Amino acid sequence: MPITTVVFDVGETLVDETRHWTDWADWMGVPAFTFFAAMGVIVERRRPHREVFDLVRPGYDLAAAQASRKAAGWAYSLERGDFYPDAFPCLADLRNNGYHVGISGNQPEAAEASLRDVGIAADFIASSTSWGVEKPSPAFFDRVVEVAGCPAGEIAYVGDRLDNDVLPAKAAGMTAVFIRRGPWGIVHAGWPDVARADARLESLSELRAALEAVG
């Protein structure tokens, strides 16, 4: 079955989240290097990323901190400079070559507007928050199929994580594309399950050729 639709994860697939996590380190009053080292530990332990806050500062009240940041005027946003340099060219190349493009990851609902505001070229944009279900739940990938409007076998899902992206996408019947970048991508590239990805990339510039090879 030929691939007609390509759906992307957001964080560390299209977007470099360095600014986002540096903002959190600054808010907590810890050096960014310390915060990033702690994140690496969380990734290696295969723990949810939110546990980094408690590792850096045991007992940290994340909900209270989020409320305080909001009260101080912080709001979720994406800037064009947050995107990896290959993101926009890749999306444009896919659409110019007849693929339908979607974007959906574990993101707040505000990410949808932010993605549109920076001029992302996509046929649909969605978030786990608006759908009410997060990866790696099979229900998330059921929603991808529903919104894409085509069989799972015609969809390629691209992400930087094996646990959240590659393995559940394959279980849903999609072509699973792994990109080795960001904290999860670097660590997960060393896991045996990386062999289950249908394609492995170092850059999104390699994606269309990879799709043609597997499709």
What are these regions (language model features)?
Residues 1-99, 108-112, 121:
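N-terminal helical cap/lid subdomain that shapes the substrate entry/recognition surface
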